[in-house]
Amino acid sequence: MGDVKLVASSHISKTSLSVDPSRVDSMPLTEAPAFILPPRNLCIKEGATAKFEGRVRGYPEPQVTWHRNGQPITSGGRFLLDCGIRGTFSLVIHAVHEEDRGKYTCEATNGSGARQVTVELTVEGSFAKQLGQPVVSKTLGDRFSAPAVETRPSIWGECPPKFATKLGRVVVKEGQMGRFSCKITGRPQPQVTWLKGNVPLQPSARVSVSEKNGMQVLEIHGVNQDDVGVYTCLVVNGSGKASMSAELSIQGLDSANRSFVRETKATNSDVRKEVTNVISKESKLDSLEAAAKSKNCSSPQRGGSPPWAANSQPQPPRESKLESCKDSPRTAPQTPVLQKTSSSITLQAARVQPEPRAPGLGVLSPSGEERKRPAPPRPATFPTRQPGLGSQDVVSKAANRRIPMEGQRDSAFPKFESKPQSQEVKENQTVKFRCEVSGIPKPEVAWFLEGTPVRRQEGSIEVYEDAGSHYLCLLKARTRDSGTYSCTASNAQGQLSCSWTLQVERLAVMEVAPSFSSVLKDCAVIEGQDFVLQCSVRGTPVPRITWLLNGQPIQYARSTCEAGVAELHIQDALPEDHGTYTCLAENALGQVSCSAWVTVHEKKSSRKSEYLLPVAPSKPTAPIFLQGLSDLKVMDGSQVTMTVQVSGNPPPEVIWLHNGNEIQESEDFHFEQRGTQHSLCIQEVFPEDTGTYTCEAWNSAGEVRTQAVLTVQEPHDGTQPWFISKPRSVTASLGQSVLISCAIAGDPFPTVHWLRDGKALCKDTGHFEVLQNEDVFTLVLKKVQPWHAGQYEILLKNRVGECSCQVSLMLQNSSARALPRGREPASCEDLCGGGVGADGGGSDRYGSLRPGWPARGQGWLEEEDGEDVRGVLKRRVETRQHTEEAIRQQEVEQLDFRDLLGKKVSTKTLSEDDLKEIPAEQMDFRANLQRQVKPKTVSEEERKVHSPQQVDFRSVLAKKGTSKTPVPEKVPPPKPATPDFRSVLGGKKKLPAENGSSSAETLNAKAVESSKPLSNAQPSGPLKPVGNAKPAETLKPMGNAKPAETLKPMGNAKPDENLKSASKEELKKDVKNDVNCKRGHAGTTDNEKRSESQGTAPAFKQKLQDVHVAEGKKLLLQCQVSSDPPATIIWTLNGKTLKTTKFIILSQEGSLCSVSIEKALPEDRGLYKCVAKNDAGQAECSCQVTVDDAPASENTKAPEMKSRRPKSSLPPVLGTESDATVKKKPAPKTPPKAAMPPQIIQFPEDQKVRAGESVELFGKVTGTQPITCTWMKFRKQIQESEHMKVENSENGSKLTILAARQEHCGCYTLLVENKLGSRQAQVNLTVVDKPDPPAGTPCASDIRSSSLTLSWYGSSYDGGSAVQSYSIEIWDSANKTWKELATCRSTSFNVQDLLPDHEYKFRVRAINVYGTSEPSQESELTTVGEKPEEPKDEVEVSDDDEKEPEVDYRTVTINTEQKVSDFYDIEERLGSGKFGQVFRLVEKKTRKVWAGKFFKAYSAKEKENIRQEISIMNCLHHPKLVQCVDAFEEKANIVMVLEIVSGGELFERIIDEDFELTERECIKYMRQISEGVEYIHKQGIVHLDLKPENIMCVNKTGTRIKLIDFGLARRLENAGSLKVLFGTPEFVAPEVINYEPIGYATDMWSIGVICYILVSGLSPFMGDNDNETLANVTSATWDFDDEAFDEISDDAKDFISNLLKKDMKNRLDCTQCLQHPWLMKDTKNMEAKKLSKDRMKKYMARRKWQKTGNAVRAIGRLSSMAMISGLSGRKSSTGSPTSPLNAEKLESEEDVSQAFLEAVAEEKPHVKPYFSKTIRDLEVVEGSAARFDCKIEGYPDPEVVWFKDDQSIRESRHFQIDYDEDGNCSLIISDVCGDDDAKYTCKAVNSLGEATCTAELIVETMEEGEGEGEEEEE
């Protein structure tokens, strides 16, 4: 490989990169330098400071040097060189001179190579001379207007090409297929050309170009390294052109070469190729098209004109040029070049003379008036993303401008080189503000305080200039000097101002609590009027003022507080402005509030037109940010939205800046405006997007700015925290208890921090408590006091990121009082500034901020507001959608479709099945409407109307996939009824419906309805549509039909009359009667006028009432309407028409109309309207429905992760979130009775009954007959039997269980069905009883002269209630009767005072709250005193703890030839676990007793795991470790023969009644544990599952223990860096959870946890669930604060402290543990103070309860040995009922073995998830349903999450996920729409791993050709 040199140069900069070939071979060890953030060219004013900065990477660390004219630059004088951490570097040139201009070369070198980048410094004035053009420097404060638009093309004319979807980067493996796809629009149909680099691609065997479903597709089969490069899709038509590029790269390609693309295989030693890299603004074909058509790439001479510059093409009209400019994508990236041959390639960018432009373009407003703030025009720059190596942004600063030469060189806009800073000072201090201003001519500087000029005053204020700086000096600051100061610099070019604040703190003054000297007064106003609320407040310090409306913070009004007078100004009052206004005043001593009621009377409709245009307030006001920017931290590749809310009169104009440079709208940066809200959307952030973002707003009255820092972080594995359900703001009274709840998610599970007013809550106060139920966290404030009020913040953190949410707690009727000093007062600061939305959701520290209420003047118009006379030109930057739609709104004829659509459509009633059979006649016009509207790219979450409290921020933070054109969720094919306008209105981004407000997306086929605002919407007039649509779009004919044409019939319907146009006056006819009810005349034709006199218009006798309903409860709305003829009823929710579905039942019985929803969801909240229509007119009434959140205990986990559920949960049939328009039926003669799906109107609650009692379960049903009722249990239909009876009737069904037994427990489901649908309900039945007898045979051990220890098993079933105690009964040979001996709680008892000449038998009964069980089996006859010689278990040979018995260590090989039954007698079962079962074995030869661990191993992987465990145990021959002595394998069965230990688990032994726990015993146990683990570590092995269950006592009397269960053990030696992701949450170390390398110290953490619990009975990290436990472990926070540690020695605490270190390097090892002073203590002579065992008992009870959860548990556990009994060598003479076989009944040993193996219950082994059935690609028709089915295997049961492209799917009525007990998983998508066309992925995860499968859903919409030919021609 030869040297590679890449050079890119222009008239501004030159960049070159070199690669040293000698370093390539050593790439894995070293890395050549690479500029990951290269420095940029600068254009600086003379005298200013220039700073080149960038970032370089490489290994070793590269050295950065700077050169100019071949000479190195050294740091000193005006030049400052700096190299920072992580490769950052900079060159700073102070006081730039003319001679400093020129090119600077930055070189980064290390041992692996060198890189260079050349940049250019242009000093203002020199640049113009160099190019022969005047230059306009880009400064922070200057302005320019959008170009003027004098003429516009016809609305039906040509449209330049556009990209509707983005071309994404493709990364494939070599040999795979690479696929690029994008969607384009334009008229006429654009011609598509694909290029690689600049060379057009020709179809071949490997390269195919096609169009699929409107997508342009390029496929490259068998990708190799020659195919790597940048591919461009070029689209051209007669109206313009557009192009978009993306890179194809091969996965695994050497990282040093990945930044280049091999473009040619040159054989020359030197090849020089020059290409142009300039954007042409011409709308006709330029060089790129010419290259595509001629397939040649000409090479112009350097410095000359490009080849197309000489073409004498006619100058295109200015408007075409403007549209082309607007529509053009961002600058095509420079083509990177990959060189692998022995040659040198230079890529040179040619210089292009800028195109002349008409002077003054864009300076005038539409009315021709000059702008009030003139500013020199500035060229638009198009930031180009080039994350590749050494990329540059090359921008022609003077392109496309023709500026007169005169006066430009000698003038410059004012600029602040340095600005005054905000200060806080004490009274009487001297304050000095300094600023430095530049500009030509020299600007004049003026100072202002709160808008009032500040002038020099002798002895107090000095204003002067010194050494080029301007100063304002306050000699003695007073409190009255506090406020906002501003400085204005102005010259002939314009003016610029900046502002800051001064806070002068009063010296020690007597503090006074707030109080009102005058309070608010009630008032009444007429809609549209302004009003002011005023009160006087006093207090020291000055109280903070917060205004509330109906208890919620006000976001849109202007408030002032001057001289103790607080005022709230409401302009242009709306009906929703009425309510209770509260002024809340607070300071450090307390808070006080006063309230007033404001009534807003509606205007008469005759004056409706008066407020169609906003009334401009008379007094200009400077801009104010109601919501500013806040700092953001996001992941690389995330989508970010920054939103501000700004008010002012006239409406301010806004620009966005990044690090002081103005941001231009491009493919990556979008600007959006919704009324007073302005947003900057970054589609995909890169590290170079890090920096300070500033939003600057100005109008004629002043300007203001806000800024924040965006930090782009490298991605981590996992998911950033987010709120499943957000908390709500709370208003409470003194003394009440308050709950603030939220549900959270994240991976790893986040830690939760609660803060008030920015400070962490202190747990020591005792006034609050934080509760957790799985992922639901609740803050409980008991008996709230005034100091509890304030802003509460919930901060979530994990290693991926953090998220926060704020809510406010406000107190009602607080009396002013002084608080004790030191008490922290509440703070309600930020409430007005948008800190908390009206829904209480709070502001999230993410890029996307949800609006609360609509801003003032906004209504529901997103892009039309505020444009009045200023029009499009006044707007700072237009969004991309302002092309033909913006023109169309001005010229299209306004048409009223109500005449045709509202009546005279004869239809026939069709069922859904009928509709699906006639798709050819059912024409869906939405497909055509959708193509006319080209919406912006929005996230999937923004398209959905979701609850204010449930927002999924992953759509912001996750890496986005290919952008798709959003389409609202659609409905089945339209029936012959009112057409659906949602596809027009839904094309624009919707406002989320919040606080009961509505997106109001549809007009209900009546444009007039849009004039009535919904909820908080501002009246916007009948001609203004809702959402983001233009008026012309709203009223545009459907399907591209001509406006004057007859509407195409839908279904079999034929319209009776032609579409008639309506005047604007007719559209405005709309009469309001009262607030909640509206009646109007629908007709404008003669026929309709005649029909009015033939009947009575509808009227509501009973109106709808506002409703509050809890989530999951039934919602019922009813109203009564009278009319003649009978009216047709239409229901709408938030403007969307409802229809009967499986979830929503609409009914009409006579005059009673109702809506019924069985289980209300958050999406059911909003404004419901009932519209009644007949020929005589129409009426409507409405109500607001609020769906309150379910209680915290009912909140579920993150909805997108779905766990397998039992068969009892039947999937409900899906409904739709966005339902179709209701059919319009002919006016019936008699009121029809609507057919209804079945409803279950009565059903029992969960029941608990005693065994033997009878149970009746009755469900009452209603609906259209016939209805079939079916009872099921666990998804299987219940068959009648002697115990169960089913009785069905017309109105219900009853299930009777005559005598309930334990097997009748479970979940019962009643399924009711008719032809219209189905419904189901479930009830849980619990049968309680006395417990079963204790299992097995009681066993006597430790037999002495007059005592013994009796032990037994617990009951196999506790009867539905926990066993409370055991009753022990005794039989002796003298009395020969059974009598009760004692009662105890544990499963062992020490029996005393036995006589040596008697024989005894024992039996045990279990007792719970329902009674006493039958007795257990009888023990064997036992005598005390001298025991006969008999074989003994070696573990019982000696109780002397100091002497270990002899152990027969064996190296085990697995016997595959013989069976376990050949050598051992298999006796009773001792226990079972997930691995299999444990049986007692007696060796035939020696009669020794062993334990047999029987595994079921079905796969090779499972067998290998068991073999690995045996192999590890062969290395672990130590007295403290349980020994494996034999092993057998036969087919799927593996048996390990193990040493038996009978003392039970260590902690079970400790809580025995007869055990005395002291610190001495703890030392003995910990010493043995350390010895055993030390030996394990010396063999190079880690245990990884140390926990109490795996520490077994040798017997029930001594203190010797053994460690068991090596199923998770791993060899560390030779393993390199080992990472695992398993263990028991409570005992696992932080590095395991974080998936970091583990070591021997990982076991030491577990030892520390065991020791902590052993000495205290408390667990340091146990939470209420595993997620909380894992979070506690990750944070590694613990203490000895509990009183349990009062009795523990300091040595013991020190021992624990040195083990529970988060950094594993700082933990003790086993050798150090054994040498620790605590374990070195003399246990024989030390003081033994008894420790309490109560906490240990509670801990064990809690741990047993927790084991029923879904913890990440270890495999292969031998903890069941805790219940081993019957340790004597004799076989039971009677046999054991629990034994798997009875040897006497079997004929041969072979039968014995076979019968045993069959008896071992097949328990599932642990298996990584896999798909036994995968999802398949689907192709469906729009409007139908799609279903993906798969089957998932794995154990533990995998959890499932579905993805649409890269977005996780949350279950809703549109997406339903079903996952049953058998592993069948389905995703059902109802009412499929074009937006559902995507790739779907099912991901299954359990503790062993994950699996995914993917399929594509293709949605067929109408053919592209249909409707296209019907465009209007003028």
From Swiss-Prot:
Residue positions where N6-acetyllysine is found in the record: K608
Modified-residue entries (Phosphotyrosine), positions: Y231, Y464, Y471, Y556, Y611, Y792, Y846, Y1449, Y1575, Y1635
Domain Protein kinase: 1464-1719
Protein induction: Accumulates in individuals with asthma (at protein levels). Induced by tumor necrosis factor (TNF). Repressed by androgens (e.g. R1881).
Keywords carried by this UniProt record: Acetylation, Actin-binding, Aortic aneurysm, ATP-binding, Calcium, Calmodulin-binding, Cell projection, Cytoplasm, Cytoskeleton, Disease variant, Disulfide bond, Immunoglobulin domain, Kinase, Magnesium, Metal-binding, Nucleotide-binding, Phosphoprotein, Repeat, Serine/threonine-protein kinase, Transferase
Coiled-coil intervals: none
The reaction(s) this protein catalyses: L-seryl-[myosin light chain] + ATP = O-phospho-L-seryl-[myosin light chain] + ADP + H(+); L-threonyl-[myosin light chain] + ATP = O-phospho-L-threonyl-[myosin light chain] + ADP + H(+)
Main location: cytoplasm
Residues in Ig-like C2-type domain copies: 33-122, 161-249, 414-503, 514-599, 620-711, 721-821, 1098-1186, 1238-1326, 1809-1898
Residues that hold ATP according to the record: L1470, G1471, S1472, G1473, K1474, F1475, G1476, Q1477, V1478, K1493
GO cellular component, one term: lamellipodium
Expression sites by tissue: Smooth muscle and non-muscle isozymes are expressed in a wide variety of adult and fetal tissues and in cultured endothelium with qualitative expression appearing to be neither tissue- nor development-specific. Non-muscle isoform 2 is the dominant splice variant expressed in various tissues. Telokin has been found in a wide variety of adult and fetal tissues. Accumulates in well differentiated enterocytes of the intestinal epithelium in response to tumor necrosis factor (TNF).
Phosphothreonine: residues carrying this PTM: T1778
Compositionally biased spans, kind Polar residues: 331-347, 1413-1422, 1770-1781
Per-repeat ranges for Sequence: 868-895, 896-923, 924-951, 952-979, 980-998, 999-1003, 1004-1015, 1016-1027, 1028-1039, 1040-1051, 1052-1063
Region (Actin-binding (calcium/calmodulin-sensitive)), start-end ranges: 923-963
Cofactor(s) listed: Mg(2+); Ca(2+)
Activity regulation note: Isoform 1 is activated by phosphorylation on Tyr-464 and Tyr-471. Isoforms which lack these tyrosine residues are not regulated in this way. All catalytically active isoforms require binding to calcium and calmodulin for activation. Repressed by organometallic pyridylnaphthalimide complexes, wortmannin, ML-7 (a synthetic naphthalenesulphonyl derivative that inhibits the binding of ATP to MLCK) and ML-9.
UniProt biased composition (Acidic residues): 1431-1445
PTM notes: Can probably be down-regulated by phosphorylation. Tyrosine phosphorylation by ABL1 increases kinase activity, reverses MLCK-mediated inhibition of Arp2/3-mediated actin polymerization, and enhances CTTN-binding. Phosphorylation by SRC at Tyr-464 and Tyr-471 promotes CTTN binding. The C-terminus is deglutamylated by AGTPBP1/CCP1, AGBL1/CCP4 and AGBL4/CCP6, leading to the formation of Myosin light chain kinase, smooth muscle, deglutamylated form. The consequences of C-terminal deglutamylation are unknown.
Residues covered by region (6 X 12 AA approximate tandem repeats): 999-1063
Chain positions with Phosphoserine modification: S305, S343, S365, S947, S1438, S1759, S1760, S1772, S1773, S1776, S1779
Role of this protein: Calcium/calmodulin-dependent myosin light chain kinase implicated in smooth muscle contraction via phosphorylation of myosin light chains (MLC). Also regulates actin-myosin interaction through a non-kinase activity. Phosphorylates PTK2B/PYK2 and myosin light-chains. Involved in the inflammatory response (e.g. apoptosis, vascular permeability, leukocyte diapedesis), cell motility and morphology, airway hyperreactivity and other activities relevant to asthma. Required for tonic airway smooth muscle contraction that is necessary for physiological and asthmatic airway resistance.
Disorder named in the UniProt entry: Aortic aneurysm, familial thoracic 7: A disease characterized by permanent dilation of the thoracic aorta usually due to degenerative changes in the aortic wall. It is primarily associated with a characteristic histologic appearance known as 'medial necrosis' or 'Erdheim cystic medial necrosis' in which there is degeneration and fragmentation of elastic fibers, loss of smooth muscle cells, and an accumulation of basophilic ground substance. Megacystis-microcolon-intestinal hypoperistalsis syndrome: A form of megacystis-microcolon-intestinal hypoperistalsis syndrome, a congenital visceral myopathy primarily affecting females, and characterized by loss of smooth muscle contraction in the bladder and intestine. Affected individuals present at birth with functional obstruction of intestine, microcolon, dilation of bladder, and secondary hydronephrosis. The majority of cases have a fatal outcome due to malnutrition and sepsis, followed by multiorgan failure. MMIHS inheritance is autosomal recessive.
Other noteworthy facts: In asthmatic patients, overexpression promotes actin filament propulsion, thus contributing to airway hyperresponsiveness. Some MYLK variants may contribute to acute lung injury (ALI) susceptibility. Potential therapeutic target in the treatment of burn edema.
Protein name in the entry: Myosin light chain kinase, smooth muscle
Gene behind the chain: MYLK
